[in-house]
A protein has these predicted regions:
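Bacterial signal peptide processing site
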Residues: 22-24
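Hydrophobic alpha-helical
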Residues: 140-145, 149-168, 234, 254-315
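C-terminal motif of bacterial Sec signal peptides marking the signal peptidase cleavage site
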Residues: 17-20
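Hinge/cleft segment of the Venus flytrap/periplasmic-binding protein
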Residues: 32-34, 40-78, 225-226, 237-241, ...
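Hydrophobic alpha-helical segments within soluble ligand-binding/sensing domains
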Residues: 61-72, 135, 190-215, 229, ...
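Signal peptide-proximal N-terminal region
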Residues: 102-122, 239-246
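Flexible loop/hinge segments that line or gate small-molecule binding clefts
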Residues: 149, 157-196, 214, 310-318, ...
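Extracytoplasmic "Venus flytrap"
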Residues: 59-77, 81-108, 123-136, 154-157, ...
């Protein structure tokens, strides 16, 4: 406790400055959401051996000589504690990440022969909604508990700098997953190559509309690095490769920063642009939102390119509501996050940036063995 107190005193001025810079995200004390209880994740009941084997075959996560879908050779002390904080509990993407993380912890315990109190433990939690203050409150709880490693998918890394610095000061290994911290203070990042994946989505949409017409981008969140990177990659494809074509971005909507309802956003978009040619979505929630809206229309005259995968999204591809979707590999991402954290705790070699897989899915390749192997996690 003395060490923590000293740290808070040392960072007092820094925290005040950061609070000022991030004042948009700060609410008065009486308005803050109550601190959430953090519960330890239960052990995995389904070992999912088949899922992991197909992951390794079709979507390996390797960098250099290290296989991040393997726990072989990792040495951890009995009772090692790992915590993971996602952005929100409403997005099914994080359930898939959690499944992969649980499997990795199960494999570590099996490999090391740990049982009972000696088992490596995983706690996985997130605020109910994507809210900066709520996520910081959860991170603060974990800092009090001082796990061996803390893995975070940042909602707004700039608002979490004090927590990042505190973790490092107290020897907690800090791993970013899905979304990096903007100052690269974490030990490593495990996630999709968002710029590359989003650029591929833009290429698919532009091809579908014949390289002409009005296009809108529905971005999940301006504050997250994933939102910024995916949006910018889409814009850059047009600027760098098709600036001589008649393609025009007519609107870029940041869903998390909107006060309007989802229906109002899309109603107004089509009212202003009745000749809209296409919509590009940047995550699971924005994709499902546009799917739901499109299904209510009497006639849909625009193409939709999605991002992420779920049962609803796959069905929309089958029904030709979507031209396709860019599926990430959340199961593999979760597994690799744990092996990366374990390597950091053990002081073993690891890369600073580890890319999990992404795969464009459309009606033509949906039933292939490769794509189906990636979609197995949807039933988990």
């Amino acid at each position: 406790m003395i060490k923590l107190l000293k740290f808070y005193i040392l960072l007092g001025c820094t925290a005040l400055c950061l609070a000022g810079c991030a004042k948009e995200n700060v609410v008065p004390e009486e308005e803050k959401a109550p601190v959430q209880e953090v519960e330890e994740t239960k052990p995995v009941e389904d070992t999912a051996e088949e899922t992991l084997e197909t992951e390794k075959e079709y979507y390996p996560i390797k960098k250099g000589a290290i296989d991040y879908l393997s726990v072989k050779g990792i040495e951890l002390e009995p009772g090692t504690e790992i915590a993971m904080v996602a952005t929100n509990s409403e997005n099914k993407f994080w359930d898939m990440v959690k499944s992969g993380a649980q499997k990795a912890v199960e494999d570590l315990n099996k490999e090391l022969g740990y049982s009972g109190k000696d088992k490596i433990s995983l706690t996985f939690t997130a605020p109910k909604e994507e809210n900066v203050v709520d996520q910081i409150n959860i991170i603060d709880q974990f800092l009090d508990k001082a796990p061996d490693a803390l893995c975070i998918a940042f909602t707004d890394a700039s608002a979490s700098k004090t927590q990042i610095q505190m973790a490092k000061y107290n020897g907690i290994k800090l791993i970013a997953f899905d979304t990096p911290d903007d100052g690269q203070l974490t030990e490593a990042l495990v996630g999709t190559d968002n710029k590359k994946a989003a650029a591929e989505v833009a290429e698919k949409l532009f091809e579908e509309i014949g390289y002409k017409g009005k296009v809108a981008i529905i971005v999940h969140n301006f504050l997250t690095q994933t939102g910024q990177d995916r949006k910018q990659a889409i814009v850059d494809v047009l600027a760098n490769s098709y600036n001589d074509r008649d393609i025009q971005f007519v609107d870029i909507v940041y869903l998390a920063q909107e006060d309007r309802s989802e229906k109002e956003i899309l109603d107004e978009l089509l009212e202003r642009n009745p000749d809209l040619a296409g919509i590009i979505c940047t995550d699971l929630m924005t994709t499902e939102m546009v799917i739901d809206y499109a299904k209510e229309l009497e006639e849909k005259n625009f193409a939709i390119a999605g991002f992420d995968s779920s049962e609803k999204i796959v069905k929309a591809v089958e029904e030709d509501v979507l031209i396709g979707t860019m599926s990430q590999d959340p199961y593999g991402m979760g597994y690799a996050t744990i092996t990366t954290a374990a390597r950091a705790i053990a002081g073993q070699a690891k890369a600073g940036s580890i890319h999990s897989a992404h795969q464009w899915i459309d009606a033509e390749n949906l039933q292939t063995e490769e794509v189906q192997s990636l979609l197995k996690f949807l039933s988990k």
